Amino acid sequence: MFDAARLVFIDETSTNTAMVRLRGRCPRGIRLIDHVPHGHWKTITFIAGLRRRAMVAPFVLDGPMNAISFMAYLQRCLVPTLKRGDIVMMDSLPVHKVAGVREVIEAAGARLRYLPKYSPDLNPIEQAFSKLKAHLRKAAERTIPRLSRRIGVLTTKFSPDECASYFRHAGYAST
């Protein structure tokens, strides 16, 4: 048995400067009109950890995740938040399995576990990312600096009760 408070789920997601709301409302009989960006946009990668009480170690990367950037994230952002006995859970993305990942996490006194392949429903941070992206669509930021700042603000908006509900939804008892 494990204590859900010791679990730290990490994952990454991409966002871009062309994110807009996908649906809208207006009075019946009136056409809904909104501005939608077209042309070139920039994509960034956001990676973070989710504990039962908070989102931790948020990091924005201008570009795709690779082995070097993932190791840098672990060493600079995630490991300082880990406590002895924590269990770091992540999916089986190839960059999560490069040499040194397990050693960095275990040196902090934590354990590493991989989720089964094709099982986003077992990772509660997926629910948090869904909410984050909905807020990003609403904000419709068009530059990388503004998008990064908005992500930083939004990561502080996840309440302890909300994080616990993501854990329950994914099947992890909130003890």
What are these regions (language model features)?
Residues 1-175:
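Short functional hotspots at interaction and active-site rims
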